[in-house]
């Protein structure tokens, strides 16, 4: 019994530590655990071919420079809010409730209306739920690279 308890305590500790290492952002008073897309391959793949995403999850795309960005929904099976942030983590553009697209390479782009460095994709409806307005600040948790 004592070994079992020791094992249980160790397993719980390890799972808590693993959860603490997951990158996160805060926006509008809500915390989202995010996957990071920091290179060209990860940014190109994005959330393609995913059937669902938990409500408290998202993907943060980190670009090398702040410039106009455009995203599309090719092979993306989840309707999304695409949120664009500048070097200072300020929301500069929003594409809300972006629908699925089955047109392959003919899927339309969803551009930023201003130069952006970071792009956060959340499940469609999150921006409305948070009542986001341009100028909202995105807070980074530990381990997310800052603009240089």
Please give the residue ranges for each predicted region.
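Bacterial N-terminal signal peptides that target proteins for export
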Residues: 1-5
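Bacterial N-terminal signal peptides
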Residues: 6-15
């Amino acid at each position: 019994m004592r070994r079992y308890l020791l094992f249980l305590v160790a397993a719980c500790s390890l799972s808590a530590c693993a959860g603490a290492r997951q990158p996160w952002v805060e926006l509008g008073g809500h915390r989202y655990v995010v996957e990071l897309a920091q290179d060209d391959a990860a940014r190109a793949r994005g959330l393609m071919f995913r059937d669902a995403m938990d409500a408290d999850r998202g993907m943060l795309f980190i670009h090398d420079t702040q410039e106009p960005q455009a995203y599309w929904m090719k092979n993306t099976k989840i309707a999304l809010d695409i949120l664009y942030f500048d070097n200072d983590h300020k929301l500069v553009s929003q594409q809300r409730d972006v629908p699925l697209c089955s047109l392959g390479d003919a899927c339309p782009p969803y551009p930023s209306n201003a130069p952006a460095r970071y792009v956060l994709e959340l499940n469609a409806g999150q921006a409305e739920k948070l009542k986001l307005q341009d100028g909202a600040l995105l807070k980074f948790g530990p381990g997310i690279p800052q603009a240089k």
